[in-house]
Amino acid sequence: GSGKTSMLNLICGSISADAGKVIVNGTDITGQKEYMRHRKIGRVYQNPSAGTCPNMTVLENMAVADLKEKGYGLNRCVRKSRENAYREMLSGLGLGLEDKLETKVGSLSGGQRQVLALLMATMTPIDFLILDEHTAALDPRTAEIVMKLTDQIVREKKMTTVMVTHNLRYALEYGDRILMMHQGKIVLDKVGEEKNQLNTDEIMGIFNRISVECGN
């Protein structure tokens, strides 16, 4: 554990900070409750089942996500007037989910669930998106599909994104800035041209050198 997921949990408010501050767009949110942050932060987890409700249909899951910014009351969650909009969103993913609105999410494949979780996390306006190793539990082919769809959504929405990954190729190919952490500290921070000049061998060399210095 280098502290990557702990850092994400601090940002999202899942755990409290012992020291320091969490500042988003110049606003100190350190003391803000997790449910309040959730309205402005989208998060996709490593486990495909973590970002969706398996016993609810695709339609019901999307309806819940659609209300995230507004909050939940005692009114009907699923609005028939939004079905066509949901179907259109899903059709753009190319996975056939637009024909599965009435299907229980628990019966979908891991890749379909992860893409649905990604779409749900970005349906409403958010300050930024957090991806917590969201392709790690998928087979290589599905991981590539999910990663390309992720890049498509992030670019279309011009969305600031923090992605934790052990896939160095993904980090180099998709990231604008690369941070490497070890024992809770940032040991590498590259952006712009410095980042563009990096390759996987160099990053592995840095990692191995740090491991040796720490006695591993």
Regions found by a protein language model. Give the residues of each.
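Q-loop/switch helix immediately C-terminal to the Walker
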Residues: 56-71
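Catalytic Walker B motif of ABC-type/P-loop ATPase nucleotide-binding domains
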Residues: 129-132
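Conserved ABC transporter NBD signature motif
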Residues: 20-28, 190
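H-loop/switch region of ABC-family ATPase nucleotide-binding domains
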Residues: 165-166
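Conserved beta-strand-loop-alpha-helix hinge in the C-terminal portion
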Residues: 185-209
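ABC ATPase C-loop
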Residues: 121-122
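ABC ATPase NBD coupling module
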Residues: 28-42, 50, 72-75, 79, ...
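Helix-to-loop junction immediately C-terminal to a conserved catalytic motif
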Residues: 12
